[in-house]
Amino acid sequence: MKIKVINPNTTLAMTKGIEHAAKSAARSDTQIVAVSPKMGPASIESYYDEYLSIPGVIEEIKKGEEEGVDAFVIACWGDPGLHAAREVTDKPVVGIAESSVYLASMLAARFSVVTVLPRIKTMLEDLVDSYGMQKRVLNIRTTPMGVLDFERDPEAGIEMLRQEGKRAVEEDNAEAILLGCAGMAEFADSLEKELGVPVIDGVVAGVKFAETIVDLGKKTSKLKTYKYPEKKEYVGALENFGRNQTTTK
Amino acid sequence: MKIKVINPNTTLAMTKGIEHAAKSAARSDTQIVAVSPKMGPASIESYYDEYLSIPGVIEEIKKGEEEGVDAFVIACWGDPGLHAAREVTDKPVVGIAESSVYLASMLAARFSVVTVLPRIKTMLEDLVDSYGMQKRVLNIRTTPMGVLDFERDPEAGIEMLRQEGKRAVEEDNAEAILLGCAGMAEFADSLEKELGVPVIDGVVAGVKFAETIVDLGKKTSKLKTYKYPEKKEYVGALENFGRNQTTTK
Amino acid sequence: MKIKVINPNTTLAMTKGIEHAAKSAARSDTQIVAVSPKMGPASIESYYDEYLSIPGVIEEIKKGEEEGVDAFVIACWGDPGLHAAREVTDKPVVGIAESSVYLASMLAARFSVVTVLPRIKTMLEDLVDSYGMQKRVLNIRTTPMGVLDFERDPEAGIEMLRQEGKRAVEEDNAEAILLGCAGMAEFADSLEKELGVPVIDGVVAGVKFAETIVDLGKKTSKLKTYKYPEKKEYVGALENFGRNQTTTK
Amino acid sequence: MKIKVINPNTTLAMTKGIEHAAKSAARSDTQIVAVSPKMGPASIESYYDEYLSIPGVIEEIKKGEEEGVDAFVIACWGDPGLHAAREVTDKPVVGIAESSVYLASMLAARFSVVTVLPRIKTMLEDLVDSYGMQKRVLNIRTTPMGVLDFERDPEAGIEMLRQEGKRAVEEDNAEAILLGCAGMAEFADSLEKELGVPVIDGVVAGVKFAETIVDLGKKTSKLKTYKYPEKKEYVGALENFGRNQTTTK
Amino acid sequence: MKIKVINPNTTLAMTKGIEHAAKSAARSDTQIVAVSPKMGPASIESYYDEYLSIPGVIEEIKKGEEEGVDAFVIACWGDPGLHAAREVTDKPVVGIAESSVYLASMLAARFSVVTVLPRIKTMLEDLVDSYGMQKRVLNIRTTPMGVLDFERDPEAGIEMLRQEGKRAVEEDNAEAILLGCAGMAEFADSLEKELGVPVIDGVVAGVKFAETIVDLGKKTSKLKTYKYPEKKEYVGALENFGRNQTTTK
Amino acid sequence: MKIKVINPNTTLAMTKGIEHAAKSAARSDTQIVAVSPKMGPASIESYYDEYLSIPGVIEEIKKGEEEGVDAFVIACWGDPGLHAAREVTDKPVVGIAESSVYLASMLAARFSVVTVLPRIKTMLEDLVDSYGMQKRVLNIRTTPMGVLDFERDPEAGIEMLRQEGKRAVEEDNAEAILLGCAGMAEFADSLEKELGVPVIDGVVAGVKFAETIVDLGKKTSKLKTYKYPEKKEYVGALENFGRNQTTTK
């Protein structure tokens, strides 16, 4: 099967890392295609970045339909555009935050998230609440490092995660740690060994969940919420989004 | 004061209607500027449309900074891009859904929303929950009519709203009716008379709340969640969003 | 328009302060009438005081009907008698706690309240929950000072608010501060400057929301919950409450 | 022991009925004193009536302190003034709504309330939510009959309860029925036989819970929320409430 | 009346202590029968122990039917098997955790639980949530001592409870303390004196609630959730559970 | 890998069906071992049956440790003993209800469950709530058929599911249907075709999730809630549960 992993930001070095993580988790007969959108931000660290990454994500989903993709993974821990992505295709689409919390809840009774800048705490709190996980998530721990700081200085990154992960275990009593950014996959194994609790990277979780749903032959429900978008005109820089739509009408 | 009312869709006839409603509610010394974005969908009836309307909305917010705008109203009942808009400016930004539910809760103990197509019910449920109104909102009633159907055939529109409004009062015991689309302002008064309960149009509510916040001299908190976006590169059709940013760095 | 601001306690010096705050926020064509009830407690710092302030509040609402009042503001951060007030008049009635949390949620993603004695914490927690704001309110911070202590010793008062406000910002990560007592209006501006986040006084918020609702021509829904009280006999010291009622029968 | 049962309304015929129910449930060595306040409404059917009944209720609690009362029952299904009552005495105070829902939840997984006029539905919904029973209470069923209609025409009353009780069992799948008014005790037994599920009258539940708490030697916590009210001046018709207070200072 | 108090663990010394507490609280005309099951764990400190205690508890409930028991108390602070117990008998069954939280909520606005090992915190959190008490319970405080450590070394036990109880009052602002284990009854009185807030032992609370429900002549609803189990075959070590069932068929 | 699928009831014909479904979903290199416990009920249709199935389930988990099992699936839609199972092994254990709701929430915005007898509705409601799915699950639809009726008369079974599934789609607007019993796998495909929405059988979902977690090399967190049970004596018919324990001490 073919799974398209979309890194919603446009930093290709990070996409490479995500691709690596995805391939290491995928089955040998699963083809991983990892991409960044053709438009959007270099990293996602605010509502602004998140919303502006979505057009590019949707475009990649739409292209995926023609590319014979069987399932999609949105590889950013805000799950940007997830619900819209489910509208434009009937192939399964999973987010890495979503996959992380569901996976974690099958391994641990309570857990914490460790992520990037403090400003995204509210965004992630509301996200995990939307997945019904408010009681299970003990804390969203942020760091002073941005998304690309983890790319640029992985040593500082792992040190920061180690520190916050330890505090999550000791102060929150977190029974698992969720890495709240798609660029942290490489740190998961060593952290897990050090911390002694499951450390969950969303990219690998998302890829495996995508494989699972394809194996089960399931597709997104097209009954109501996730029907194909209504056909209509789009103008300006986003004009193409109104064209060649697979739509309900 | 100058209030910019942004109709997130690109249907100018609808923007005209919104402008008319906004002006009729604004104080004589309030200048209303009603616009549609330069890019995006002709109407918003799905997550797809909603997310794709946001870049255009943000662009209008940013332009507003240079235009000397004192406050912004996002005039679509999904409040698209509201949190991002609060990041790019320190001027108050209010959504019409948000304004509607807060206003309604000061007039009625329980209420229902009447809106467009069934597919957006989930979206609106999650939205009113995010405002803490899950207990007060009895029902989100949808109609078979799309956003622009109400523009094209106002007579059918009012008839549909009358019918669902009546059922909201009789079956839900709704003590107020919220019109769940920016293009329904013109119907509010006659519906209110017929139904005997407050009928709330979000555009006028949003404009008045915006005036109030400006009068109070309040600005959006820039401490954490709504800080200016981090400065970074944007590529492709959205390249401009990385340029000339008012940012934290 | 004429807005009656009811300070539910009987301390006229405090009513003067509230009147001053209300007038400073009101439009020039808005007439502010600030009163204390003819019966009740000198301050409200318990359920006991709160409930016993309500008969006096209701009396003032009823009188307001004859005085040509267009809207009412209940100026105590427990919103005492708010729902009953909405029964005895069809003019809009807003509470200052209610107004504060709705206003704050349009300016900040998360916030804390700073108020008087520790014993009222439970009362205020339950109140903000009833407005659906449990997720947004990070903390109700109390001080060892009572309501009238803030009147008697404003210097100690501002110092106390400064201290708790600072802890709210630093420890709670509050993005706005709500002053949880009607007698704190005078401190709002200097606190806002010092703390660097919106500081919200409920009296001015309430007055502006009242103006807004009158401007919109909206009245309280009389369909069900807020119908006029059933006509019936009242005895004893409250005998008058059964007389000359505007009632449903 | 001596239990004072306070019917918060001033209709003595109803107080008699409540006294009868209380005595029939009390142990032989429990002395029941049933009273109505000296001031307030003839019945409670709105927020207005509810709040205006509270001063009279509090007065009776305070008198009870001198009368050697061991525990108090507030015998109206809105539990008016319950939290204030717990402030003015350290003797246990229980409400009949509170007692009913806790008792019911030890007998049935899900249940419905049958009560008087439609207008009080919101009030009772918010009340049962405040006791954490939102998931257990399936429905608050109202009837077109007021409180005193049940006194005046018990035959119509029982018929109405039978009808709504039956619908609660058949349509809501209620596994117990709670009689949502203090004047319905006399109907409980025959309804229980007919409906085949527990039918709970709050007055007898409240009296037995009060006995239990006295037996256990427990008193209301005076640490924080329920401390004695702060000593202060009261004016006007409620002047006495500031006098001879048992207070914290 | 005859109340059977079931200590779900098989440590008879602890059952003796529970019997003592139960008898000290029961009325003189109440016969207390305290037992341990014939099978199961020596103490309950995990989901494992809890579930494995349930067959023994159910067996004791069933025997109670023949022994002329009027009501049952399940004396472990996890309320093991409570819902199943309500299926196999129509006599009232109360759990001591359930009784504790309902009793506490009639005495205090907010409270904390002090219990045994850290590992059961999740279990107790989910339990109090299931009783709707998430807002009232401020904290579940655990200790490094197991259930039988409190039996073996009561002096260390009381010291531990004193310490955590004090922190509950000072740090959580708990207005009552709930002893989260059936073997702590003996410590309740002295702790209450020291801490100055109600200290609630579940065994005595459960016994008194059981007496109350018997006095009221109420039985468990057999309409739906708590119907007698369906008759069916059981095999292996639990074979007897399929025999001589009082069942619906 | 080796996955042990435990049908918690002792009806081997049903275990065969579950094995068939599991094998059809498993990868070719996954070995499925499907068993029924050596003790317990022939079917699970009450709290009684559910709790009494748990000792047998736990025994099978423990045996699995010696059998070289890599992961466990508990194949009953009440997920009996799930938390205890996670204590006795560090291999992943998933429940089929849990798997179903997480899978469904990646395919559909809102869904309903169709299951056996009405009496288990409360049990399943509380279960899906414990997974945070209260907002997504629109309805738990029951049928007059018991678990084994579906085995005995599959034609009546499919007809019943078809009927309730249709009502779920039409009346609840369910966008997916969850089959709320392990014995319904065989009906899933034809129902999905007829109803036009995803129809989810928990057994196949559980098996695939188990494979995924094994692939990811993840194990249950042993930090706190799911630590191995404390070592202790067990007596009577369950005596073996105290022996040869893998425990924390």
Curated annotation (Swiss-Prot), chains A, B, C, D, E, F:
Disulfide bonds: none annotated. Optimum temperature is 45 degrees Celsius. Optimum pH is 9.5. The record marks C181 as: Seems to be responsible for L-isomers recognition and racemization. InterPro entries: Asp/Glu/hydantoin_racemase (IPR015942), Hydantoin_racemase-like (IPR052186), Iso_Racemase_Enz_sf (IPR053714). It catalyses: a D-5-monosubstituted hydantoin = a L-5-monosubstituted hydantoin; D-5-[2-(methylsulfanyl)ethyl]hydantoin = L-5-[2-(methysulfanyl)ethyl]hydantoin; D-5-benzylhydantoin = L-5-benzylhydantoin; D-5-isopropylhydantoin = L-5-isopropylhydantoin. Strongly inhibited by Cu(2+) and Zn(2+). Slightly stimulated by the addition of Mn(2+) or Co(2+), but also by metal-chelating agents such as EDTA or EGTA, indicating that the enzyme is not a metalloenzyme. One of its GO terms (molecular function) is hydantoin racemase activity. Keywords: Amino-acid biosynthesis, Isomerase, Plasmid. This is Hydantoin racemase.
